[in-house]
């Protein structure tokens, strides 16, 4: 396990501070109130500016457009850890809304952005509003999203390390599948390996059925049988907390014609999108290309088709028909077309890319084909 100092350099943190403060000035913000909770999709905003990987609910950062950030820790012990291991911030013991509100009052600032409302508990937000009636609160999560979308070279190094763990996980998983084995047993072996190799967090989805429907570890009680289509979805946060996603479908025995055709459609769709992942391309155009590729082949799309990842498992830009974002070099994009099978269930393939001027750079090396066991 890496120490906080090994996860991020001082130069990288200074880069982030500079970019966020530049955006704050453009938005006429004096303070950004950054929240986060320990959940795979709700930690990234706070961690991005603090390097604090395990926030309790309510722990918050007051990030000023100028001056030293202030971290509100839940307990004195946690405040001491932040001060000694992370540094660069003033620490305050206590992270309740009244404590934070009192500090904001002392600054005299009135233009406070919140990042983000979806990572802040409703009662906390309501208390802030009650304690600070004269303060203008606005959600500025998009401000941080814009900064976080484009990864630095340091971040991309850790993204690549995470992708390697995904390939390692799939290699072991493929070797463990056999009739009669329980899903959960197999995935626990995979989790043990990748965590020994430095993964911070692992999030699996799986299925084992002729008509597979994706589920989570709490439902991984099925036993593998001949004729099953088997989902492997591993979203792994590597040694510095950056996620990548690898999705593959395997067949225990020869697949039927419907499954084989759906697998071909998934692969065709991935191949077509590979070349679209360039700077200047709109995410909505990629989404339409995925839908067109699937529907022109006589199938329908199932699960959502893609998104970005980073310190959160699910980040903007999203690959859908509404989050219209122009791709930039060094964005990290996951594409995972899911094709519905007419008889039930679906076929699912996907992986993580880096946007480059030459098209999507594949980070995973695992075979894309429908693996027949």
Residue spans of the language-model regions?
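Active-site neighborhoods and metal-handling regions in enzymes and metal-associated proteins
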Residues: 1-373
């Amino acid at each position: 396990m890496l120490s906080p100092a090994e996860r991020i350099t001082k130069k990288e943190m200074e880069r982030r501070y500079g970019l966020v403060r530049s955006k704050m000035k453009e938005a006429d913000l004096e303070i950004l109130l950054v929240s986060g909770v320990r959940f795979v999709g709700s930690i990234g905003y706070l961690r991005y500016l603090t390097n604090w990987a395990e926030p309790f609910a309510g722990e918050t950062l007051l990030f000023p457009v100028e001056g030293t950030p202030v971290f509100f820790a839940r307990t004195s012990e946690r405040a001491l850890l932040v001060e000694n291991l992370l540094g660069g911030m003033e620490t305050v013991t206590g992270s309740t809304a009244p404590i934070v509100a009192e500090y904001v009052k002392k600054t005299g600032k009135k233009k406070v952005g919140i990042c983000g409302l979806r990572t802040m508990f409703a009662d906390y937000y309501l208390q802030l509003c009650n304690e600070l009636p004269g303060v203008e609160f606005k959600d500025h999560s998009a401000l941080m999203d814009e900064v976080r979308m484009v990864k630095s070279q340091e971040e991309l190094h850790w993204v690549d390390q995470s992708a390697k763990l995904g390939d390692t996980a799939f290699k072991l998983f493929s070797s463990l599948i056999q009739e009669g084995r329980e899903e959960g047993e197999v995935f626990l072996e995979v989790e043990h390996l990748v965590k020994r190799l430095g993964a911070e967090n692992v999030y699996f989805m799986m299925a084992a059925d002729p008509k597979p429907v994706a589920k989570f570890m709490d439902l991984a009680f099925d036993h593998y049988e001949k004729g099953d289509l088997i989902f492997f979805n591993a979203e792994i946060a590597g040694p510095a907390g950056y996620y990548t996603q690898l999705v593959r479908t395997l067949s225990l025995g020869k697949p039927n014609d419907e499954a084989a055709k759906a697998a071909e459609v998934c692969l065709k769709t991935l191949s077509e999108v590979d070349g679209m992942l360039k700077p200047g391309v709109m995410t909505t155009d990629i989404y339409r290309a995925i839908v067109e590729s699937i529907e022109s082949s006589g199938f329908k799309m199932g699960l959502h088709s893609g998104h970005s990842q980073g310190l959160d498992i699910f980040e903007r830009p999203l690959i859908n028909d509404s989050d219209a974002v122009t791709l930039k070099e060094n964005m990290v994009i996951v594409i995972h077309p899911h094709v519905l099978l007419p008889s039930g269930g679906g076929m699912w393939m996907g992986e993580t890319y880096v946007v480059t001027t030459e098209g999507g750079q594949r980070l995973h090396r695992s075979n894309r084909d429908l693996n027949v066991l």
